[in-house]
Curated annotation (Swiss-Prot):
It is found in: Cytoplasm. This is Tyrosine--tRNA ligase 2. Its EC number is 6.1.1.1. A motif ('HIGH' region) lies at residues 42-51. Belongs to the class-I aminoacyl-tRNA synthetase family. TyrS type 2 subfamily. One of its GO terms (molecular function) is ATP binding.
């Protein structure tokens, strides 16, 4: 195992919050493999780059010699995690959960080492609780404590219903940590309440409390909201290489650095050198290409990454797209015809519709087929004719 100082530095890279750091240091000094847990409810079958921020950290713990468990919340998925929701989340059927879980396992092994990953389902112990066990578990917390959760607080203040079973969710997730005697649990910053519940339940059941390590939420292609399928601002890890390349190249130059910190495996010193190069005048597009190729090679292959870059060059560089062009921000749902007019590429929407019909309007080098088409969140190069360009961000 790596030295404690070196291991701690790697573990803390990109971490939003570590509760508490001194307890993690103490656990590392014990010189034994720590029990590391990451839980996920298989509510959707596709994993995107936002999910990989935490999986990358889990992979690091594997490389450092610790015991990693990917916990599939098949039981809790049937309850429905209320985190971040202003309405009750509909529970999934057992069939949906198991089908999604199989897809999850296939995808996470693109990141985690299968030989070093233990897969568990929390139904193993939660199904055994029974009515008496559920009542005993519920007795560990009060309604007042549950209403400290931001989402519950807002719903209660707004007169929105909160189902009793939703109060159980943090307790059930916390009980996972008791059942597994977890040393460290990973999660996103939106899971803080649930993660701390695990610490509380472990303390009350005579266990050493787990360390909570929270990773930031990856901002999506729009540069504003967290990456999610529902927001349409995501990059799926199973997407075609050319699709991934184009999406990564569409992010803003500022957002690129966040992606480097959270998604790249390059040394921090190298990333800092990239920043210095850009400040010295290097085109940030060249740095973004390196990021795109690194990510594509990870989930596909280096050959696929090279091919995706070449396709991108063929589509865009040969069209002689200028580096400098007007930039605009527009709301999602705006049709192409309106975007072309409001960005000054066409004098009117009628002209914009005519340009589309004539095949003279392009988005990211592709001819627009429908003037009513509204692009999803992201940053795109719009072109009319050979010389009119605008970089438009859809939010």
């Amino acid at each position: 195992m790596a030295s404690i100082e070196a291991a701690l530095a790697e573990i803390k890279r990109g971490v939003e919050e570590l509760i508490p750091e001194e307890e993690l240091i103490a656990k590392l000094k014990e010189g034994r493999p720590l029990r590391i847990k990451l839980g996920a409810d298989p509510t959707a079958p596709d994993i995107h780059l936002g999910h990989t921020v935490i999986f990358n950290k889990l992979r690091l713990f594997q490389e450092l010699g610790h015991e990693v468990t990917f916990l599939i919340g098949d039981f809790t998925a049937m309850v429905g995690d209320p985190t971040g929701k202003n309405t009750t989340r509909p529970p999934l059927s057992r069939e949906d959960v198991l089908r999604n879980a199989e897809t999850y396992k296939e995808q996470v092994f693109k990141i985690l080492d299968p030989a070093k990953t233990k897969i568990q389902f929390n139904s193993e112990w939660l199904s055994e609780l029974g009515a008496e066990g559920m009542i005993r578990l519920a007795a560990n917390q009060t309604v007042a404590r549950m209403l400290e959760r931001d989402d519950f607080k807002k719903r209660y203040a707004g007169g929105q219903p909160i189902a009793i079973h939703e109060f159980m969710y943090p307790l059930l997730q916390g009980w996972d940590s008791v059942a597994m005697e977890t040393d460290v649990e990973l999660g996103g910053t939106d899971q803080k309440f649930n993660l701390l519940m695990g610490r509380e339940l472990q303390k009350s059941h005579g266990q050493k409390p787990q360390v909570v390590l929270m990773m930031p939420l990856l901002v999506g292609l729009d540069g504003e909201k967290k990456m999610s399928k529902s927001a349409g601002n995501y990059i799926g890890i199973s997407e075609a290489p050319s699709e991934m390349f184009g999406k990564i190249m569409s992010i803003s130059d500022d957002l690129m650095w966040s992606y480097y910190e959270l998604l790249s495996f390059r040394p921090l010193e190298e990333i800092e050198q990239f920043k210095a190069d850009v400040q010295a005048g290097k085109n940030p597009r060249d740095i973004k290409v390196l990021l795109a190729k690194e990510i594509i090679a990870r989930f596909h292959s280096e050959a696929d990454a090279d091919a995706a870059e070449q396709e991108f060059v063929n589509r865009f560089a040969k069209n002689q797209i200028p580096d400098e062009m007007p930039e605009f921000d527009f709301d999602a749902g705006t049709p192409v015809a309106n975007l072309l007019k409001d960005a000054g590429l066409c004098a009117s929407t009628s002209e914009a519709m005519r340009m589309v019909k004539q095949g003279a309007a392009k988005v990211e080098g592709e001819k627009v087929a429908d003037a009513k088409f509204a692009p999803e969140a992201g940053t795109y190069v719009f072109q009319v004719g050979k010389r009119k360009f605008a970089r438009i961000t859809i939010k």
